[in-house]
Amino acid sequence: MPAASHATLGARTILAAAFACAAGLAMNLWMAANNRDGFDVDFNQFYAASRLAGSGLLYDWDSVRTLEAEHAPTVRNSRLPVVAFAEKLVCNLPYASAQAVWLAGSLVSILVFALAWPGLNRLLAAVALCWSMPVALGLVLGQDTPFWLLGAAAGFLWLSRGRPRLAGAAFSLCVCKYHLAVGFPILLAAQKRWKALAAAAAAGAVLLGASFWVEGLGWPRRYWVAINHPEFSPAAPRMANLRALAWWLPWPGAVEILLAIPVAYLLWSFCRRTPCLGLAAAGAAAAGTVLGHHGHAHDFALLIPLLVFTVQRPEVPIWLKSWAILLLTPVPTLLLVGGKPFLGQLLVIGFILTALLWECLVKTSAGAPPPVPA
């Protein structure tokens, strides 16, 4: 193909992507303008918690809600002491200034995530981010999911460049939502990336120890009570994870554990058979939303890498690509938060498990060797 034709094709692709991004942004801006839950509800809980970090009252609900009520509706705090203490870097500012800095940091984190994730098509990632209602919800509510994505992307970028210790340290930044990172140790162990796993464990141990320094020896008990309060997860049936599926059955805790075993094994097999680190990381992040005990609609921003990899790879069948494109629309989010959560759960959980299983079956039939650890 002549160079001029290549240039024309490239320009058309960029224009189409720009149009798609503009349409997605317009849709999400309209959603934000009609938001009924209030802006920065989650940021408000982080702001209040950071003011109490180090006082021994971080999980004292009366103290927390008194501070939260100054700015927005009250939400129960669920962050570890070291996370709440670190948020003082922003939350020591006046509330409006802290809001602006938090939003700016979130936007930068999302941009770096899209640029840094190994192997991700940047144009498709930009379109996916602009169309993603979970990303928009996270920004509107002031969630810390963007910082989780930043830590994950930085970790896998360093891992792809042969810097496993730096990668492990970066993974520890996912401590803000540690339950969603449960797929990462499975990936690192499956691919025998022991240096990165050891570094992540060491960094995590340091952060855990720092939590005792911040909040005293009794914080684990107070934290356990806080996260098991009925008001902490009032919308558990609307989550798209194993906990939500087990919610309707007898002995839901035992059912969730039993369901987690084959899902963890599927992720292990997927990571063993996938030589592309970016794709394996995408599967681990997506599986974390299924295995994690707690996760709302905004947390499904973690699916974006797997959705983009599914769309960008020519060998993926059209029916699986179409499923991924459907998940990039507002449909699953609206189903989860609306009156049809079970349909949303089937769409989200079904896609993640199907994508991992398809990859395992293809790699098994092709006889691909396991990836070489960095």
Task: Kindly label every feature range from the protein language model.
Residues 2-166, 188-304, 308-313, 320, ...:
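Primarily membrane-embedded glycan-assembly and transfer machineries that use lipid-linked glycans
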